[in-house]
Curated annotation (Swiss-Prot):
This is Homocitrate synthase, cytosolic isozyme. Its EC number is 2.3.3.14. Pfam families: HCS_D2, HMGL-like. The lineage of its organism: Eukaryota, Fungi, Dikarya, Ascomycota, Saccharomycotina. It catalyses: acetyl-CoA + 2-oxoglutarate + H2O = (2R)-homocitrate + CoA + H(+).
Amino acid sequence: MTAAKPNPYAAKPGDYLSNVNNFQLIDSTLREGEQFANAFFDTEKKIEIARALDDFGVDYIELTSPVASEQSRKDCEAICKLGLKAKILTHIRCHMDDAKVAVETGVDGVDVVIGTSKFLRQYSHGKDMNYIAKSAVEVIEFVKSKGIEIRFSSEDSFRSDLVDLLNIYKTVDKIGVNRVGIADTVGCANPRQVYELIRTLKSVVSCDIECHFHNDTGCAIANAYTALEGGARLIDVSVLGIGERNGITPLGGLMARMIVAAPDYVKSKYKLHKIRDIENLVADAVEVNIPFNNPITGFCAFTHKAGIHAKAILANPSTYEILDPHDFGMKRYIHFANRLTGWNAIKARVDQLNLNLTDDQIKEVTAKIKKLGDVRSLNIDDVDSIIKNFHAEVSTPQVLSAKKNKKNDSDVPELATIPAAKRTKPSA
């Protein structure tokens, strides 16, 4: 029996600090996502989103601070009463007044945050590190006394002084937090910086490390993955990455990255086929389109156009796909209605239409399609019309013998018969 080949994209076997095969998700669509410019979630919509996330399998659902507004408090209490499998968290300032309200809502844990960079200490709360440490200890001990989880996070971690960061994390770790948080609040960090900070922090604290990455410079997914490689265990995500400014690590995008590195873990833990429905739910709620190049669910995500690509995909999808669309309840699509098409793609379309043409005839009709494609944009109906007209012209009793040479359906990769729909923004 041939031994299975090792996954070249997996964590290195000897890297015992890596959590690529042992990570957890904190979904913040109902906290960070509420800070997205278009977001307004009423109670009913929050409950619908929370149930969908729970069904998908996220480990934690983070909610807006109950002191943000009276309705925020009521919504927090309502979601806590749903009996979800996911643990419910709320996100508060490092302040006793906030903590006293939060612990009475029924949450499973409280996420405490305070700015530690010189920018936030000067222009936000105006406090020094001694005050921050004292406040953190007071709030943490109070929350712990209520028997619920507690996370302490610095805000703007990557623009904070490293000595200040390590000192505050050592302080809170000693009194027993469940985890400490690293927040790239302005999206300035790159993967190398993330890896180095996480590895340094791992030598200082014994608790789990949670990471929160903004996407201002396009590194949120890469930073999240690198954080797990470095030893962080929990990653904050939101559906479609919605959040303050241009958001944080997207749930679907991170799943695309993680299934490559840890396929067995990801497939066994999360209902990946639910991603499309969850993204549609949230996209409709905030009135945005799902981007065409969105990992997994973008309408071009599994579309192949160039002739040489199509030929290889039809023979073995792994030639041009690192992700299997079937893992996500999706189908690949060969875009054959264009001048770049190849005869193998047209042959697949001929088979879908249940027509019989020889390879030479398929090459001939392909030339006709490419010729028209040089003149104008084509659609599926154009190509089907050319194929059917050509078939009618050449049909003879001899052509029927081509049936004997057709592949069985099981030998041909499953293809979508029409391209994925282009989403349009819902009307107001």
